[in-house]
């Protein structure tokens, strides 16, 4: 206990010196060794015993993680490392590598300033490596590289010393190619990873050794020595001469920025307020005595303390008892406890200053992405943009009717803890629907509801989430209010895909200055008049007001947008969410008396015009796709390609490496259920495969009617398809 107390004292002292802080994440493709690396870094810093490191999986503290052998949540820990005789505080987040839990990676990247990208020396960069690197660069998080499992190259693939260096060079080149393509400016500004400069380390997390060019100079151990030690199976000597934690954490401290440096570049990317305001300056310079600006990146539940909000403190200091505002709510809350994480344990401290990652209780209105501040009306941080979208849904029911009220509360809670999960109540069927990133994601959540929340549930078979869209433009359609006193003339048309992409990337929002948004839309090819009239953005859909001088329209526009949003949440064809639609209001006639243009009149009028318009514009469906990457011995390649093509898959690329074939394909999510078992049979169990989100595409016309019919039947809608006249005659 003495050692632990001493560690806490060192951590709390260093917290107050931002130059000595490094906030870092460890990111990688699944099974490339992130959690084993994290544990050995903790052992090196004296947090857990060296004997248990790598086998204890301290960071995988959840039962589900240990049972499945994968990281599901992002875990936080603070530790101390000595570099050049100076102590440094390292706040470390270990993130999941499985594509279904990518939301945790995205959120963790908002909290950190640097990332250790882990790549398996044998497998090289994989789809999820690319995804996590993109997430890091998008949040302006600087990467360094750790090439793991070098011992496997030598002992399993039997490569010689020269071939080993060539292969390692290829991994570095590929990572740099990704950085250059994703962020050319940062690449030019010195963010490329370079072994000679010291921003790359090589080693084995399992056997606790690592080498880098600075480490070679320090220890005199060369690449040839590494090769000989591995060949002889003498990992112990290698770990004594070149300890993993020393090589990796020295690299982190030397090359990844402290909060003072990082926030100068990052604040303008993640916050669009006035940089010259007091809070703007305070965030840019990480002032501990400025106004509080804290961004919540994670919500978890402590059985004793209730909800714990973890996040990054950009400005000010957090102390127990202080009163704060949470974005999206007008009332204040009182901070109850402030603390830091040491793996699964949360340790209370008196005060946490800017530049740190903090855990807070008492913020009952906070959700992931909330801005917590002492300023009333502060511009909130930009929302966290997730790379993937929920593509699979299950219906959830309580096994025992008496548990229904508890289930509703539990679903609200899990949605708060995991914002990549979407919970909706299907009002027609009374079912609770849970949409997630994939089958595994939903399985884990369902298991947690039963295990942690003590509610027995039954779930339906997984169902694919579709999107409604349109194929052509319509003339303006008249929507009348039930009392016939108000009329709206709205046309609908497909929204340009470049604009859709910019909305998804967060480059076009309703929060940004109007002139900036207008300019961006004009650059992307939108007509100047339309770009001027943006009234609302909902998911990847836009509502434009092109009217001139209509009396009372300003007072009713909010209700018009409510009607627009209702349709965008559930389209007329299948009640699925709508994507990539532009609605343009070209004219309106409104009753002069406000009593005749209330919500019950205006919302149905705008809603019906859009619903009818979509049906006239060839309403269709988009289905989600996954990119599938399969590694298989060349002799068994035929079985793998046949399996993919039999699922409506398109082979995008095929390459060979040694006796392995690497197949890249794009397959509809609807066809991927049961793939794991089938691909094993087709390849005698020798295929390794992974997936990533592959966007949405139009459902082929040959199966559209069948799929629409299945969705309508499942939702209890009429068998006959709706017609535009059904909405216009209302």
From Swiss-Prot:
It comes from the Archaea. Belongs to the TRAFAC class translation factor GTPase superfamily. Classic translation factor GTPase family. EF-G/EF-2 subfamily. Its main location: cytoplasm. It comes from Methanosarcina mazei (strain ATCC BAA-159 / DSM 3647 / Goe1 / Go1 / JCM 11833 / OCM 88) (Methanosarcina frisia). This is Elongation factor 2. Residues 19-260 form the tr-type G domain. Keywords: Cytoplasm, Elongation factor, GTP-binding, Nucleotide-binding, Protein biosynthesis. It is found in: Cytoplasm. GO terms for cellular component: cytosol; ribonucleoprotein complex. The keyword Nucleotide-binding applies. GTP binds at residues 28-35, 94-98, 148-151. The modification Diphthamide is found at residue 596. Catalyzes the GTP-dependent ribosomal translocation step during translation elongation. During this step, the ribosome changes from the pre-translocational (PRE) to the post-translocational (POST) state as the newly formed A-site-bound peptidyl-tRNA and P-site-bound deacylated tRNA move to the P and E sites, respectively. Catalyzes the coordinated movement of the two tRNA molecules, the mRNA and conformational changes in the ribosome. GO terms for molecular function: GTP binding; GTPase activity; translation elongation factor activity. It holds the Pfam family EFG_III.
């Amino acid at each position: 206990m003495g050692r632990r107390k001493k560690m806490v004292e060192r951590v709390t002292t260093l917290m107050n010196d931002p130059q000595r802080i490094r906030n870092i994440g460890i990111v990688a493709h699944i099974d490339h060794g992130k959690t084993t690396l994290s544990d050995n870094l903790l052992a090196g810093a004296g947090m857990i015993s060296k004997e248990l490191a790598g086998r204890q999986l301290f960071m995988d503290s959840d039962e589900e993680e240990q049972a499945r052998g994968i990281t599901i949540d992002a875990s936080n820990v603070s530790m101390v490392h000595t570099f050049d005789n100076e102590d440094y505080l390292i706040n470390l987040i270990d993130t999941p590598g499985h594509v279904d839990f990518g939301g945790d990676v995205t959120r963790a990247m908002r909290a950190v300033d640097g990332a250790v990208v882990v790549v398996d020396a044998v497998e090289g960069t994989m789809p999820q490596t690319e995804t996590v690197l993109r997430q890091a660069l998008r949040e302006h998080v600087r990467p360094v590289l750790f090439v793991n499992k070098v011992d496997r190259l030598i002992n399993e693939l039997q490569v010689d010393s020269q071939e080993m260096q060539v292969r390692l060079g290829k991994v570095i080149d590929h990572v740099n190619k990704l950085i250059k393509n994703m962020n050319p400016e940062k690449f030019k500004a010195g963010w490329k990873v370079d072994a000679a400069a010291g921003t790359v380390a090589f080693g084995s997390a399992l056997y606790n050794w690592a080498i880098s060019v600075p480490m070679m100079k320090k220890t005199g151990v060369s690449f040839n020595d590494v090769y000989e030690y591995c060949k002889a199976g003498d990992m112990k000597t290698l770990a004594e001469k070149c300890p993993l934690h020393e090589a990796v954490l020295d690299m982190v401290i030397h090359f990844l920025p402290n909060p003072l440096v990082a926030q100068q570049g990052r604040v303008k990317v993640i916050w669009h307020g006035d940089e010259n305001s007091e809070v703007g300056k305070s965030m840019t310079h990480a002032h501990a005595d400025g106004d509080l600006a804290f961004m919540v990146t994670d919500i978890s539940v402590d059985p004793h303390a209730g909800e714990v909000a973890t996040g990054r403190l950009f400005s000010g200091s957090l102390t127990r008892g202080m009163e704060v505002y949470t974005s999206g709510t007008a009332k204040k809350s009182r901070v109850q406890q402030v603390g830091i994480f040491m793996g699964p344990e949360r340790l209370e401290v008196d005060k946490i200053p800017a530049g740190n990652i903090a855990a807070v209780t008492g913020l009952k209105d906070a959700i992931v992405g909330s801005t917590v501040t002492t300023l009333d009306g502060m511009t909130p941080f930009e929302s966290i943009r997730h790379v993937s979208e929920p593509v699979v849904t299950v219906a959830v029911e309580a096994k025992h009717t008496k548990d229904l009220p508890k289930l509703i509360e539990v679903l609200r809670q899990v949605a708060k803890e995991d914002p990549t999960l979407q919970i909706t109540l299907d009002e027609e069927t009374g079912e609770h629907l849970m949409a997630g990133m994939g089958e595994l994601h939903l399985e884990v959540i369902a298991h947690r509801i039963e295990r942690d929340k003590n509610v027995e549930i039954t779930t339906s078979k997984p169902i694919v989430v579709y999107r409604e869209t349109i194929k052509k433009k319509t003339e303006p359609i008249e929507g009348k209010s039930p009392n016939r006193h108000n009329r709206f003339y709205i046309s609908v048309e497909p929204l340009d895909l470049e604009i859709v992409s910019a909305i998804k990337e967060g480059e076009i929002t309703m929060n940004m200055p109007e002139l900036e948004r207008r300019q961006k839309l004009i650059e992307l090819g939108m007509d100047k008049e339309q770009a001027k009239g943006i009234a609302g953005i909902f998911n990847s859909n836009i509502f434009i007001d092109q009217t001139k001088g209509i009396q009372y329209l300003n007072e009713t526009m909010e209700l018009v947008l409510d009607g627009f949003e209702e349709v965008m949440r559930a389209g007329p064809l299948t009640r699925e969410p709508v994507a990539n639609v532009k609605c343009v209001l070209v004219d309106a006639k409104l009753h002069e008396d406000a009593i005749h243009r209330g919500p019950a009149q205006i919302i149905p009028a705008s809603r019906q015009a859009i619903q009818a318009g979509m049906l006239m514009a060839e309403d269709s469906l988009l289905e989600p796709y996954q990119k599938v990457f399969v590694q298989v011995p060349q002799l068994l390649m035929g079985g793998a390609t046949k399996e993919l093509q039999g699922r409506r898959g398109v082979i995008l690329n095929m390459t060979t490496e040694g006796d392995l074939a690497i197949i890249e394909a794009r397959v509809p999510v609807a066809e991927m259920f049961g793939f794991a078992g089938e691909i094993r049979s087709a390849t005698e169990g020798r295929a390794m495969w992974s997936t990533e989100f592959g966007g949405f595409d139009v459902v082929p016309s040959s199966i559209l009617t069948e799929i629409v019919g299945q969705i309508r039947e499942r939702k209890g809608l009429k068998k006959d398809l709706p017609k535009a006249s059904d909405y216009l005659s209302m």
